[in-house]
Amino acid sequence: MKFWNKRIVRKRRKVIFRPPYSYDYTFKIMLLGEPGVEKTALAQKFCLDIFSPSEKLPVGVDFYVKTVELQGKKIKLQIWDIGGDERFRFLTPIYCNGANAAMILFDITNSQSLNQISELTNILREKKSDIPIILIGSKMEIKEFRELQRERGIEIAKKYNLSSYSEISTKTGQNVENSFIDLTEILLSQ
């Protein structure tokens, strides 16, 4: 049994396929750092506008996507939340393939959370030497327990030749969006 509609047959025109979601740019952004530095909380706050303090660590990697409009361009940000646990560390170089940018997070209330910065910057630059990397100090809302001052974060960012330094609060949302916008602007300027 055949079904057809005369009007459709007569009015058949050339159809131009355009994907429902077309972007001017798509950027892969890595979130790296020790366990407990709020990488997942940062991704969730930016992409989903939720704060969910969780003890659950990503098993290897979690993915988030957010579309932003900047400088008249529609930009898709693919955010890769890389598990910081020791048992997944061997996967980090594999996940970093094709990355356009990265954020290395540390906890300003725990100076030990900076232990991996040298290793992480080396892994990222091994894959792409001019990759923009931002150093992010998390948990800025807990000022009374601060172990690392802002000036120290800036020094570390300069020492490792990182693009910039920022402090965020995933609980209040302070500087969360600005950090991603700053990184996206760096990518657009390249």
Predicted regions, residues:
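TRAFAC-class small GTPase G-domain
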Residues: 2-190
